[in-house]
């Protein structure tokens, strides 16, 4: 005789949680809108306006994720109940085992959709930029900044985001002084936004012949790509624009050109640079887009009274505003805000950040 109570209770709980999400995620409104968008995309002249068609396609994907998943949860519960009934009637252990496996898989689908509730911010669904700056500490800090660049690139690639190094500045001996990475894909900003702050590395330095422990700092600053229809008022008189020859430790990630652009916004001290293209005109346009996005994020953080490190606060790259500590000799990486630890330091440096990201998002940082 099979013990059916646990699996039937689990299915009841899945139904209840899915029903809560129905309300929270506006299922009925989204289902109706999905029908409208799908009809519009079937019109023969929709591609006469390519930008609108692309926006509709993106909207449809986002709507389908919610609508189709809730339908999958509801039909999945019915199907699994049918399997349990069949297993009991036929005294079939294999069918009952299959039902338990499918119930576990359905629970994971539900968890993934529940996690979307974390992405309720206005810009969470957007593409994202990530700036990394080395702190004081010379070569050791610059090497640490490059390690962070590699870590965040690996994370993005593992999650299916298109990553592009827009700008990178070589360190004096090794590593990098700073870089800007762009992540293209849904919820890139939502996933990364809690990473803004100072990252502290403690290790025996490979650049110190006596093998002493060194502490280094580097800062990360995350900001969303913003729509062109968001008005950001920038006075051209407030800008200092420099051109320079691109250099970088980005390897295949970055073009070597004579057309790199750096823009400094004098009132805030915000600095952006772009060397991704061989065209100075395109680099300038990208840099202006970066500047608008960065000023938008700085204003949002100011409005939220956020004490995170901002671009005009590089002196804060030290003990005060740390978010995570990477102590390699003790094999311990700890998030100082959530208390989450991971002792597999190599995996984290290879981009395994989800444990930290999920904890910080769930805690509402």
From Swiss-Prot:
The modification N5-methylglutamine is found at residue 252. Its main location: cytoplasm. Keywords: Cytoplasm, Methylation, Protein biosynthesis. GO terms for cellular component: cytoplasm. It is found in: Cytoplasm. Methylated by PrmC. Methylation increases the termination efficiency of RF2. GO terms for molecular function: translation release factor activity, codon specific. The keyword Repeat does not apply. PROSITE patterns: RF_PROK_I (PS00745). SUPFAM superfamilies: Release factor. The keyword Chloroplast does not apply. Gene3D superfamilies: 3.30.160.20, 3.30.70.1660, Release factor. Peptide chain release factor 2 directs the termination of translation in response to the peptide chain termination codons UGA and UAA. PANTHER family: CLASS I PEPTIDE CHAIN RELEASE FACTOR, PEPTIDE CHAIN RELEASE FACTOR 2. Belongs to the prokaryotic/mitochondrial release factor family. NCBIfam families: prfB. HAMAP family: Rel_fac_2. This is Peptide chain release factor 2. It comes from Colwellia psychrerythraea (strain 34H / ATCC BAA-681) (Vibrio psychroerythus). The gene is prfB.
